[in-house]
Amino acid sequence: MDLYPEENTQSEQSQNSENNMQIFKSENSDGFSSDLMISNDQLKNISKTQLTLEKEKIFKMPNVLSQVMKKAFSRKNEILYCVSTKELSVDIHDATGKVYLPLITREEINKRLSSLKPEVRKIMSMVHLGAVKILLKAQFRNGIDTPIKIALIDDRINSRRDCLLGAAKGNLAYGKFMFTVYPKFGISLNTQRLNQTLSLIHDFENKNLMNKGDKVMTITYIVGYALTNSHHSIDYQSNATIELEDVFQEIGNVQQSDFCTIQNDECNWAIDIAQNKALLGAKTQSQIGNSLQIGNSASSSNTENELARVSQNIDLLKNKLKEICGE
């Protein structure tokens, strides 16, 4: 079945109706975006688990009626596999953990659906979130100590602990930082806060590095998702929930600049993932923070360090007393 109407030809769209595939591209001064959409007919080699109910085992009916019922209740899975890529520069003022970046939006999905034939578009009801790969790249020289914290959350969920899809901490001193999150769940296209389902929060700790208006880094992300007419259409690969890419290495030659020493022993950190954050680029409002602690609490760690120092001082004092007493 050809999913795309023949008259739909846009300048930003490359269409191959024979292969049921479309590519959307857009680039301007704000950034670059690219989207791929391919129909299920081109991916028949992917195995799917079908949910079936044998009506003949529930109702006693004549054979002719049975055949009519089977035909009447047969259903074809319509699946569009989509890959969306976007790149944008981030102002240092917007990199303080006070705003969120929606990685998938209703506007984007509606744009994809508008390219389909009406009979296919009207039955699409679900979006299945497969994977999100995020790459941060510094817009300054290598070697500057610039820790950064990232959290991907489902901001529809009220509990700040349960909303977390993945979190990571890195350092842009090496030029870039990348990780992948696998949400692996489906949601209705009619859900009220669809734009908040994949919310990216980023906290650039070296806030005095530049002034407001200066672009501190580039965020490039790829979202793999599928649009379907059923919640039972998709199986996910058995990946881990989050994967951290091994990109903590020097990139290029710094020359005449001192390269900082980065401490990798910090396992306890927190990031503010409070609800009702402003959209990236919008005016921010004062709000009550809600930090998610990763690892043990910092206060507990400080207490343990203090106890260790006290114990060490007691041992030193004990040795001095032994020397004075001639023991």
Swiss-Prot record:
The keyword Disulfide bond does not apply. Residues 297-327 form a coiled coil. This is Movement protein. Transports viral genome to neighboring plant cells directly through plasmosdesmata, without any budding. The movement protein allows efficient cell to cell propagation, by bypassing the host cell wall barrier. Acts by forming tubules structures that increase the size exclusion limit (SEL) of plasmodesmata, thereby allowing viral ribonucleocapsids to spread directly to neighboring cells. It is found in: Host cell junction, Host plasmodesma. The lineage of its organism: Viruses, Riboviria, Pararnavirae, Artverviricota, Revtraviricetes. It comes from the Viruses. GO terms for cellular component: host cell plasmodesma. Pfam families: MP. Homotrimer, through the coiled-coil domain. Interacts with VAP. May interact (via N-terminus) with host prenylated Rab acceptor protein 1D (PRA1D). Keywords: Coiled coil, Host cell junction, Host-virus interaction, Transport, Viral movement protein. InterPro entries: Caulimoviridae_Movement, Viral_movement. One of its GO terms (biological process) is transport of virus in host, cell to cell. Belongs to the caulimoviridae movement protein family.
